[in-house]
């Protein structure tokens, strides 16, 4: 690994902070997401424990830490002209403390935290006005962090915009619109949003590095039948490659435009939007992704119409099992080889530095005798770190860094505390917040 390799961890602040409506923060789409009756307004109280949590990161030898600036803490409604200074001050102090501890901040600019007002009054990124609200939000952050933050990620797991639309893109299916139309329009709009963010970052702080990010899980064909191979190829293109193809080549890929054409869907892109995507592709510094698992997929033998088959594959919810890999209790396949495969695949396709900005395993853990025994997670990390070492040293992949998910416990994207990822155990359960005391796990010593 390079001397400047960015070892560390990553966290979604909206899932950890709490500080529900403190210091001018507004409601966001994660706050209002109703999945479980679990109390989420405190989360794991990172808002009041952030120094303690960063101290643990320093003890573990972190060289980098990725966090997200909660949009609704900076622009409570999302459409304000001026940012909330108390919100900016909170993250500014965090950046300064990280630098004091020798930890490089990596900042995500939207991560499940769009102001709820933009969902309910604009339908999020389905509305092009929201792209400009987002660009204003990005400018507020970069102006404040200029000269201190070197690395930005424009949009967390942008390829999931349609599949977790309320949470990832603040959007719901409009009345009278098909989900295929929403798939096309929303994917185009978030690509424009990413490109606008790149433009703002490079204009405000030309020395900063900016990357685009996907939530990656490679799709393997279930069998060696040609139909299954074609199904996996199509799924990978639309789920994994579309984003990077657009970001790196500066235009929508032919297969995406053909998908729209086959369904008589107008792309509705202005020349200005095409230009900003093209310009951003020339300025993008690296490609980031999360990796937890691989998937398998098969064709649908009973569907003969090609359009229907493609739509079934895009919105497939079958969760087919791979017989060659174990899974955690949520059914996520543990496949370290898939991480090496992904690194080699992306690097040979795009020839840009890569950055693993999330990798970890969710486990239902409890304390025993005041300790958390974490052999299962340690084994997971050992396998995945070995895989990335092979990708770098043997396959020649240019890898910037590896950020584990995650330094501390937090609520999952579905607001569960039971699904834990943290290097540091936070003592609370489903109903009882207890004292939110921190306990370092064995895994903090990996």
Please report, for each region that a protein language model flagged, where it lies by residue:
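Aromatic-lined carbohydrate-binding/catalytic grooves of carbohydrate-active enzymes
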Residues: 60-88, 107-110
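Active-site region of glycoside hydrolase catalytic domains
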Residues: 1-34, 77-79, 88-446
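Catalytic domains of carbohydrate-active enzymes, especially glycoside hydrolases
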Residues: 49-70, 282-287
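Aromatic- and Gly/Pro-rich amphipathic surface segment
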Residues: 26-55
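Short, flexible active-site loop motifs that bind/organize anionic cofactors or intermediates
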Residues: 40, 47, 78-81, 329
